[in-house]
Amino acid sequence: MHALITGAGQIGTQLARELSAAGHEVTVLRRGTGAVPGARVISGDAGDRDSLRAIATGTATETSTIDVIFHCIHAAYSAPVWRRELPQRELAVMDIAAELDVPVVFPESVYAYGRGAAQLHEHLPLAPVSPLGEVRAELLAARAAHPARTASVIASDLVGPTATAQSSVVLGMVFTPSAAGRGAWVLGDPDAPHAVTTIPDLARAMIAAIPLASTGDTRLTAPTDTARSQRQMAADAARVAGKPQRTTHRIPGALFALAGPFSPMMREMQHQRYLWAAPSVIVPGRLTTELGLEPTPWEDTLVEWHGGRAVDPAHR
């Protein structure tokens, strides 16, 4: 199989690892020129149809025509930026995929479902309650209306080997300070269960979703372990790192309101706080019930994050 991945962030990079490890040919289209392990890298814009067509057909690379596209590009955490940069590129990718009759698989967040994220299943209607959620709902609707075969794999907040403190709320605000012996700073209710999807689990789910892609867009939930509270996540991270558990601090809502006019990210996070103020749970879907995919156990996720070594409490 020859896979084209658009974007080389935390998801695209992990996908390249998984696919190349399985013996597949991988081409990555990214804006930069940095290498991606296991992949051929081409610098360019996924919104450029001519370039995209040349890559997809093998003309630009003197390789075989691609068999699937994984569309993983993203943009700055801002609803106006998302609306300006994402729809046109998704449309270009779907147009080329329809021409070649190959499927497109997208990673997707829970944002388009609004408060439905409290118990998110694959047949839940779209009901956004934030500007970012509205953009995600528009993208999902466009996929459903396009003749290309598509699949959208829904994940919650992400952690994993390719995540950074800047790209992962859980890593940056909960895991990292707890592992350093400091108190975690959390959004919303520290005791509300909140699902966390590992990036390797999402990547494997996207690969498994290829044959399920269809016109009208197939929506699938990524295998995601039992939801835990942010307070519990902080305690677990401290334990694995061999540090004492510190006080978990709740970020005041007023801080987001005050910083919002000066920071697009803080403004958007203010709108997204509802996801952390109540339970946010992903219900197992077809990838688990039909194909048997299971999430990585939480303890394994913690140990991998801490470099493969949990600290024995008796030797702290």
Language model region names:
Residues 32-34, 39-100:
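NAD(P)H-binding glycine-rich loop region in Rossmannoid oxidoreductase-like domains
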Residues 160-173, 209-220, 243-244:
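Glycine/proline-rich active-site loop of Rossmann-fold NAD(P)-dependent oxidoreductases
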Residues 187-192, 218-228, 236-242, 289-291:
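Glycine-rich Rossmann NAD(P)(H)-binding loop
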Residues 234-281, 314-316:
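Terminal hydrophobic/aromatic helix or amphipathic segment near a protein terminus
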Residues 286-288, 292-316:
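Amphipathic terminal alpha-helices
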